[in-house]
Amino acid sequence: MKLMGLDVGSRTVGVAVSDALGWTAQGVEIIRINEDEEQFGLDRVGELIASHDVQGFVVGLPKNMNNSLGPRAEASKRYGDMLTARFNLPVDFEDERLTTVEAERMLVEQADTSRRKRKQVIDKLAAGLILQNYLDRHGKLTREK
């Protein structure tokens, strides 16, 4: 079962897709969105579902360090609800605390990437980390429709 991992922000959504066996995650792209104008990039998500034969979603849930849910986590949950309503595919959530920090560290230490280039790929890499963490923990989508 191929899964799509999503790192949802207020201006971008990082997208990653798993392999068919659910072992590895690969960053795919960054979709520009605008929450204020209710432009959530769902048409592009639909195109990616079709082209990658995706059968479920893992959405990053940015919990606070004390495990509570703040405004960004609530926005991610709403995005998950929109995915369910639009595509009728199962959605699960993965704690994404510090994945963007980890992604930035990887880009600096391992790829020696400039700040400008990091901004262009960080959300895609974070989505890959969210999905890979989920796959490592669960192996497949654990929440059904």
From Swiss-Prot:
Q: Which UniProt keywords apply?
A: Cytoplasm, Hydrolase, Nuclease, Ribosome biogenesis
- Any one Gene Ontology biological process term? rRNA 5'-end processing
Q: What is its EC number?
A: 3.1.-.-
Q: Pfam families, alphabetically?
A: RuvX
Q: What top-tier enzyme class does this entry carry?
A: hydrolase
Membrane-spanning segments: none
NCBIfam families membership: RNAse_H_YqgF (TIGR00250)
Q: Which HAMAP family match?
A: Nuclease_YqgF
The family line of this record is:
Belongs to the YqgF nuclease family.
In terms of PANTHER family, this protein maps to: POLYNUCLEOTIDYL TRANSFERASE, RIBONUCLEASE H-LIKE SUPERFAMILY PROTEIN (PTHR33317:SF4)
What is this protein's name? Putative pre-16S rRNA nuclease
